[in-house]
Amino acid sequence: STPNGEEERIFLNIAEVGFGAEVVIRMNNVGRFAGSKLAYPLSLLSCLFSYRKRPVEVHWGNNKQSVPALTNLAVANGRFFGRGLQPAPQAQVDDGLFDILLIEGLSAIKIATRFPALKDGPPPGEPGMTEFQTQSILVTGPATVGVEADGETLGNLPASFSVLPNELFVVRP
């Protein structure tokens, strides 16, 4: 925990705020009843019809953006997650930066039609999708907006994410 008593968690790959976190929350609940193979598609389908976009504020560097209808925010250290999706195809785990994909205002139909495109990364210039890099980011908004990291439910907003450069030493053959 931090000096302020806040819980501190470490993630290696990708954290999400909004839609993706809701899918993970439901997947953890549905998986107990539907089995592991059906948990993800059932949770995704359920969220497509029930997820409500909410207003949030995103702070990074000297920037602040009000997002009136957050669909999803991915904080990516790695490139891939969720069965081959690439929210951040340029992400590098050793560059000291998060690659952020902010998706706002997309309806369930638009999410469903654009979801397959994330296999190759977000389409360039896609309306409602903003990409940027930062060392840290703070997301504030209603306490009902979920947060997940590496497939684990972390709780709800507010949430802050900071890169810990050169903290993990990996040996590969």
Enumerate the predicted regions with their spans.
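Catalytic core of DAGKc-family lipid kinases
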Residues: 1-71
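Glycine-rich phosphate/pyrophosphate-binding beta-alpha loops
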Residues: 16, 20, 74-88, 153
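Electropositive phosphate-/nucleotide-binding environments in soluble metabolic enzymes
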Residues: 17, 35-38, 91, 105, ...
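Active-site/binding-pocket entry motifs
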Residues: 17-18, 29, 79-81, 106-108, ...
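Short acidic/glycine-rich loop or secondary-structure boundary segments that cap or lie
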Residues: 20-23, 66-68, 81-84, 108-111
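Short, surface-exposed, charged loop/turn segments at secondary-structure junctions
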Residues: 29-31, 88-91
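A generic local structural motif
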Residues: 43, 58-61, 85-87, 123-125
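ATP/nucleoside-binding phosphotransfer catalytic cores, i.e., glycine-rich phosphate-binding loops
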Residues: 60-67, 92-93, 98, 102-173
